[in-house]
């Protein structure tokens, strides 16, 4: 059996990213043979009040960030940036959220450096028949919905518990929407509707305290999108404008993105309305959509709407997010470190390999980036 070493990065090149991949409190719980293959970045647990000396008995050792990225067989780094990938070399494995489909430069670096990318975003528990069961990081997705709503309400100076009664509509119904609804309810916003493409009766595990509504969308023409209400079919944009808070939790198909609102639509919104874009894909969902940062988390659309689009919002609740992500990752430490044969034997890992030794495995990368299907995957 192959025995790879794991370099666990504690700092991030991404602005204000504070999550760790493994929670310091979980390291003592790992099997001894796994701990012997784990090297941490210096000061790994400092933000959690845990010194290196306290973690030393539970890992092989410590190294600098640069050394770990350059020498580890497997680099565990949740939010890799271009500079991180550029510092890696042929044969290494990057395990994190590379989001290569929409990142042409990172993809090119991975091809050129002949890297293997195991993508958190593609790690799912699969049923025996091969169908989708549950996303491995579904709790992180819930925290994304929760954190985005929490942070956006803070920035807008709003709560549903005091002041004018607020109403909200959440677009989509997955883990992020569940987290968004949890945050809205926790902060006194009880008039909440959830829009889903499925028939309301076909939604599994609905949240019983919210109103579920079906909507249908005409690609390329938001004017023809409708919500089915007790009054009949209503135009989507007008329906959204009746609410104080709109939360977008849609998992977009990059080959066929949906747009729910254009800048012309915001004039119908009440002044001070809030659009919380948990999905925050550039140009998708809303015509003006773009990811924002913790340093500059919102901007105004028209004269009426505040738009929030921080695309790594779980970092707002970094301690809780680290705990959930660590719990999700730990079962996969052993198969990842046992190498390619173990990856191939585990559907969660084999189906999450986006690029393998510089070869593109995920066809969505080719389609979205307009690349040739043959190596070296030239842009066409």
Spans of features found by a protein language model:
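A short helix->loop->beta-strand "cap" motif at the edges of active sites that frequently abuts
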Residues: 36, 89-93, 113-115, 189, ...
């Amino acid at each position: 059996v192959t025995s790879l070493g794991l370099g666990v990065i504690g700092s991030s090149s991404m602005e204000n990213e504070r999550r760790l991949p493994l929670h310091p409190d979980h390291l003592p719980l790992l099997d001894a043979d796994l701990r012997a293959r784990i090297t941490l970045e210096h000061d790994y647990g400092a933000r959690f009040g845990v010194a290196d000396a306290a973690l030393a008995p539970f890992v092989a050792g410590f190294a600098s960030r640069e050394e770990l990225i350059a020498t580890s067989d497997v680099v565990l780094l949740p939010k890799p940036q271009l500079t991180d990938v550029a510092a890696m070399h042929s044969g290494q494995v990057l395990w994190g959220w590379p989001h290569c489909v929409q990142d042409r430069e990172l993809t090119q670096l991975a091809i050129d450096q002949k890297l293997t990318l195991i993508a958190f975003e593609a790690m799912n528990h699969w049923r025996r028949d091969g169908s989708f069961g549950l996303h491995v990081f579904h709790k992180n997705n819930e925290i994304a919905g929760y954190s985005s709503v929490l942070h956006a309400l803070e920035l807008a100076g709003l709560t549903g518990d005091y002041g004018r009664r607020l109403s909200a509509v959440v677009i989509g119904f997955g883990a992020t929407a569940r987290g968004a609804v949890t945050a809205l309810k926790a902060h006194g916003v009880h008039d909440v509707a959830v829009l889903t493409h499925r028939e309301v009766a076909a939604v599994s595990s609905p949240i019983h305290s919210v109103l579920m509504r079906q909507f249908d969308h005409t690609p390329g023409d938001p004017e023809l999108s409708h919500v089915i209400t007790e009054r009949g079919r209503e135009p989507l944009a007008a329906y959204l404008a009746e609410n104080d808070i709109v939360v977008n939790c849609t998992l977009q198909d990059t080959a066929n993105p949906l747009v729910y609102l254009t800048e012309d639509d915001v004039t119908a919104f009440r002044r001070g309305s809030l659009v919380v874009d948990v999905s925050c894909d550039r140009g998708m969902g809303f015509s003006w959509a773009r990811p924002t940062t913790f340093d500059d988390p919102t901007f105004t659309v028209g004269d009426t709407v505040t738009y929030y689009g921080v695309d790594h919002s779980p970092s707002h609740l970094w301690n809780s997010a680290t705990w959930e992500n660590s719990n999700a990752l730990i079962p996969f430490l052993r198969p990842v470190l046992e190498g390619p044969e173990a990856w191939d034997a585990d559907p969660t890992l084999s189906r999450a390999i986006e690029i393998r030794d510089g070869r593109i495995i995920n066809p969505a990368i080719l389609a979205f980036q307009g690349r040739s299907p043959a190596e070296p995957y030239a842009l066409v």
